[in-house]
Amino acid sequence: IGYKNARNKLDLETLTDILQHQIRAIPFENLNIHCGETMELGLKAIFEQVVWRNRGGWCLQVNHLLYWVLTTIGYETTMLGGYVYSTAANKYSNAMIHLLLKVTTEGKNYIVDAGFGRSYQMWQPLELISGKDQLQVPCIFRLTEERGIWYLDQIRRQQYIANEEFLNSDLLEKNKYRKIYSFTLEPRTIEDFESVNTYLQTSPTSVFTSKSFCSLQTSEGVHCLVGCTLTYRKFNYKDNMDLVEFKVLNEEEVEQKL
């Protein structure tokens, strides 16, 4: 990810730098599924895919890699399991399908997640405190705790859609207030995600098998390729508004972008 730490301090600033370097260097993607390959959970396979092959992965992979990195350099890091909210179903997933991290530094707990992608991706660790609005470049994030269950939501800006033909696109997030996922603080291991890792890449009902996607954060926004449709969102480009641009690519252009 190109990160060099001259400060050599395991604090919030270093943690933030590592997270931002990772989300701008390692795409959130599921391309293996659509290339006839398997999304592996083993650390050796993930390292080979991400580091040596210069690829990305989904949450179970990129956050597993991040967990290994943070633990290795000395951060107190715990794996947690999340239940992703579906706007279509209007509920959280029944299965634990998301991997996120809790990191303790300087006496405080933070949620760290490099694997949600698109315009829902946090750019900084979120302090694990209930009911506090935490402003970041992409949006306002809010964690809320109720009876031992934590909920991550976001409050989004208004958006200007440059291509009018995409005003009603399913790829366009239309809600200002968006639920993202829920989780508990029960520690998990990577083995807890083995069955769901298989399900997500084999079930015909999984969104990951029906669509290919690849998203990468930039210093100003996020690129997202779903199928042949490329979206670029520039956060807060003017007047507290995001700019959203769409482009449909042909097969040659898709390969060039990837």
Swiss-Prot record:
> Binding residues for CoA, per the UniProt record?
Y199, T205
Main role? Participates in the detoxification of a plethora of hydrazine and arylamine drugs.
Instruction: Write out the residues that bind substrate.
Output: I97, H98
Q: Which residues form a coiled coil?
A: none
Q: Where in the cell is it found?
A: Cytoplasm
The catalytic residues are C59 (acyl-thioester intermediate), H98, D113
Give any Gene Ontology cellular component: cytoplasm
Return the similarity comment. Belongs to the arylamine N-acetyltransferase family.
GO molecular function term, any single one: arylamine N-acetyltransferase activity
Q: Cytoplasm among the record's keywords? A: yes
Name of the protein: Arylamine N-acetyltransferase 1
What the entry lists under PANTHER family is as follows: ARYLAMINE N-ACETYLTRANSFERASE 1, N-HYDROXYARYLAMINE O-ACETYLTRANSFERASE
Pfam families membership: Acetyltransf_2
Q: Which reaction does it catalyse?
A: an arylamine + acetyl-CoA = an N-acetylarylamine + CoA
Q: Which InterPro entries match?
A: Arylamine_N-AcTrfase, Arylamine_NAT_domain_sf, Papain-like_cys_pep_sf
Disulfide bond sites: none
Q: Which organism is it from?
A: Felis catus (Cat)
